[in-house]
Amino acid sequence: MKRLLPLPIAALLFALTAVAQPATPLPSADSRYQIPPTNDGLPGAGPIRRAEWFQKTWIQHRREWAARVALDQHALVFLGDSITDGWGPEMGGSFPGLKVANRGIGGDTTRGVLIRLREDVLALHPVGVVLLIGTNDIEDQAEPETIVGNLKLILAELKKSDPRMPIVLCEVFPSSASMKRPAEKINRLNELYAAAVKGDPAVTVLDTWSLFADANADAPASLFRDLLHPNAAGYAKWAAALRPVLATLGFLETEPDAFTPEPGFVSLFNGHDLTGWGFRPTPAADIEGAKRWQASDPHAAAWPVVAKAISFDGQAASDDGRYLAKAGRLIVATAPEGRRIQQLSTTREFPRDFILRLEFRATPNADSGIFIREPQLQCRDYLVAGPYNKLAKYRPQEWNEIEITVHGLAAQCTCNGELLEEAFPVPATGPIGLEGDRGQMEYRRIRIKELP
């Protein structure tokens, strides 16, 4: 026989049971940070990771970041996966004086970034974004065309939030087929990334693939602890590659360069505008050469024609913004097209013998040049881009000094004291010029001493 509980006790137990076991489960405090259980209705395409370890990492990071939204307002955001995450909350202290926010999650994909973009990044109203993403998509067998589709959506959301916000798009780092990230697939993805942003002045592509790739187009063990994640030396190399671009964007090195030329030398660049510099008419031979190149090669560089001389006296930048003066640096910025052949020249010529000294700093694989009266001495990220790739004293992504001594119709050229050219042929007179081609090149302390 079933015994019945007294009515007051039964009512109390029912009430307690109702509280302890609600018919509809209440959402957890972390539900807003969780990965959606299915892909239904989610933006983008391709893999979204849902392994238990990844979900825990995702929730933990996003919960911590939500508590820092007010503190991280107007930071430069580093956005990505474990490579970014592993750099630490302050990016290893690599950018002193710059407010940064690390928004990398280990294991994330382009689609994962797209899902969390609004809360993790846009809510901070960032001054800019440094983006490195895509390697985990490759491991999960996503096709490069799918991955770049997600990149386009990410960029569209960033631009919708702030059309003028600068974005530094880092090429996917090399890895290894042993890590399910073969070189040919990474290269294809990087090609598509570059094509997706071609012509966009707000996006600067940084060649971080050439920065790291070894002779086999893989990640070197000396810089990557597991052929995927950089070690301390690898992060230092990435930071050095970023600094020149961040300086051009106005985030670093904002103070003028305090430099006084040696006795007998005269500055050709005043450090704050392009007075004394301009564009000269494009020679007919260059026009014809450009036409032949562009007709035969769909990937040929843009090569704008200058019809008449243009002076930039008093201007902080050339009319197209490619050449600009900032804090003592004459910058040849990365062209939105990826490559664009141009030449900025002094408005005066130099018929007398002279010694020309200047310093330059190149982003990875950058290609520029110094015109000596007319012919061009290649000035590049030499160890990657050549042609002087055996230099022992060249300092990648740091300042290096070029000295050019002209006697008659020949020039001796050195870099940090190492010989580049013993007798480089030059004409009797002509200007000093700086070429723009690929990547970013900065020049400073440009001075000349005319000899008797």
Task: Map each language-model feature to its residues.
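Oxyanion-hole/transition-state-stabilizing segment in secreted/luminal serine hydrolases
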Residues: 84-101, 110-152, 157, 168, ...
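Structural recognition of the beta-strand scaffold that forms the well-ordered cores
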Residues: 75-79, 100-104, 128-133, 166-171, ...
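Acidic/histidine-rich helix-loop elements
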Residues: 40-53, 88, 96-112, 139, ...
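Solvent-exposed loop/turn segments at secondary-structure junctions
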Residues: 82-86, 106-110, 135-140, 173-177, ...
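Carbohydrate-interacting regions of secretory-pathway proteins
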Residues: 152, 252-452
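Catalytic His-Asp segment of secreted/periplasmic serine-dependent ester chemistry enzymes
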Residues: 174-253
